[in-house]
UniProtKB/Swiss-Prot annotation:
Keywords, comma-separated and alphabetical: Acetylation, Chloroplast, Coiled coil, Membrane, Phosphoprotein, Plastid, Plastid outer membrane, Transmembrane, Transmembrane helix
Name of the protein this chain belongs to: Plastid division protein PDV2
Cytoplasmic compartment segments: 1-213
Primary location: plastid
Quaternary structure and partners: Interacts (via C-terminus) with ARC6 (via C-terminus) in the chloroplast intermembrane space; this interaction induces ARC6 homodimerization and leads to the formation of a heterotetramer containing two ARC6 and two PDV2 subunits. Interacts with ARC5/DRP5B.
Modified residues (Phosphoserine): 50
Expressed in which tissues: Mostly expressed in young leaves.
Annotated localization: Plastid, Chloroplast outer membrane
GO molecular function, one term: phosphatidylinositol-4-phosphate binding
Chain spans, region ARC6 binding: 235-307
Length: 307
């Protein structure tokens, strides 16, 4: 339909241009006739005199204005003839497309009628049940797509030829795809069911494959985190993080130690001393004495003075 509309627009434009050129030709011919009749109002003597003067001017000028107008009108006529030829070709193309569309619709209606008649004959059959009859019923019961330029019964549209390499001989495979419509009984589900029937451990293999994928994804996430923690521990940030009570268990993914030494009630962490006040034990930080570096330490050390 879009092509027909485009052809119609082009045809209308060509007709419009042809009419405009025809108007130009008429105007030029009118101008020539006016120039020729300009001396009718003069007297016979004056007309004779003007005719003599005109002949003299024509002798001096090789091409008069009348000749120029005639040549221009002739060129316009040629252009109009070319436009008329183009217009006729466009009209023929439009008629051809309309005729093809009509014939296509007529053929599709006849195909649909024949398909319905086939279904009626299949329903009237009461004999032995054959597999080919079921396939024919399925084939005739498919929907006809009128927007896909089908000129035949609704056969499935084949995909393009496969350009992949054949696994056996290494050459390009020129065979079409084996996929067909499920309505004909040869769909992908049918092939898959046959493969599952042939393989005895189809279900368990799929589940084990899923578990392996899950474990692989978990390992990809955990291993980089373990590497970062190892680098932090090696650089000295590990004890500081443990002092602050940061949990590095990673949601239970890292293994716990089997046995951990329990801290005794009277034991304090490094850097603190046990002090008993009023019968209550406390861990306090050791006292630090600030001593100027210049008077005591010859070489400055940032770790000097730690308990």
């Amino acid at each position: 339909m879009e092509d027909e509309e485009g052809i119609g627009l082009i045809l209308a434009r060509a007709t419009e241009l042809r009419l405009k050129i025809s108007d130009c030709i008429d105007n030029s011919s009118t101008t020539v006739s006016d120039n020729g009749d300009g001396n009718e109002d003069l007297s016979p003597g004056e007309g004779r005199k003007s005719e003599i003067i005109g002949n003299q001017d024509k002798d001096f000028d090789s091409i008069s204005s009348e000749d120029v107008d005639e040549a221009e009108a002739e060129r316009l006529l040629r252009i109009r003839d070319a436009l008329e030829a183009l217009e006729s070709q466009l009209a023929s193309l439009q008629n051809l497309r309309q005729r093809q569309q009509y014939e296509k619709q007529l053929a599709l209606s006849e195909i649909d009628y024949s398909r319905k008649m086939l279904l009626e004959k299949l329903k009237e059959y009461k004999g032995k049940d054959f597999e080919v009859l079921r396939e024919t019923t399925t084939f005739a019961g498919e929907r006809v797509d009128y927007e896909n330029d089908l000129l035949l019964p609704p056969y499935p549209v084949h995909p393009p030829l496969s350009l992949g390499l054949d696994n056996n001989n290494g050459y390009l495979s020129h065979l079409p795809s084996k996929k067909k419509s499920d309505a004909n009984g040869f769909g992908s589900g049918h092939v898959r069911n046959e493969a599952e029937a042939k393989s005895p451990n189809g279900g368990s293999g799929g589940s084990s494959h899923g578990v392996i994928r899950f474990l692989g994804s978990v390992a990809k996430i955990v291993l980089p985190i373990i590497g970062v923690i190892s680098l932090l521990s090696a650089s000295g940030y590990g004890p500081e993080m443990r002092k602050r009570g940061a949990s590095l268990n990673l949601f239970g993914l890292l293994p716990h130690r089997a046995t951990r030494g329990k801290r005794t009630p009277n034991q304090c962490p490094p850097g603190k001393v046990l002090v008993i006040e009023d019968g209550e034990a406390r861990c306090l930080v050791k006292e630090r004495v600030e001593i100027p570096f210049d008077s005591v330490v010859a070489k400055r050390d940032v770790t000097y003075g730690y308990g």
